Amino acid sequence: MAAVIADSGFLVALGIRRDPRHAAAKSFLAAYKGEIVVPSPVVVESCFFFSTAAKISLLDWLRKGPARVAELPPQAYAEIGAILGRYASLDPDFADAAIVWLADKLGCRGILTVDTRDFGVYRLKGGKRFEIVRWFG
């Protein structure tokens, strides 16, 4: 797998030492050789769970790599809105819809998430499923 998209569950596990998946996130990161893409809304969503020090650490980690932050152009909002509408019964958040949009644009199906229920339902263009990367348990 050349690239994966990271959801907030992965970043939270990585950034909070007491998270039960912290060691698994660190181990995955140490072994993974591909690119990790983080949509900018996922950065915002992740910071909600962090202390100020953890927010600063996350931003420093993102600045240094190996992850790349993907910004969303305003032109994407109509498509993201359509994705939100398509999955309204799941009550998706903006970050999830942004991940679906970005995955379509990048042709990237791999995702680092703890939200296997929703990402098992979301579909990319052409009906393709996400490939949920096993990074914990």
How would you describe each model-predicted region?
Residues A2-V4, G15, A23-D91, W101, ...:
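PIN-domain endoribonuclease scaffold, especially VapC-family toxins
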Residues S8, S40, D96-A97:
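Conserved glycosyltransferase catalytic-site signature
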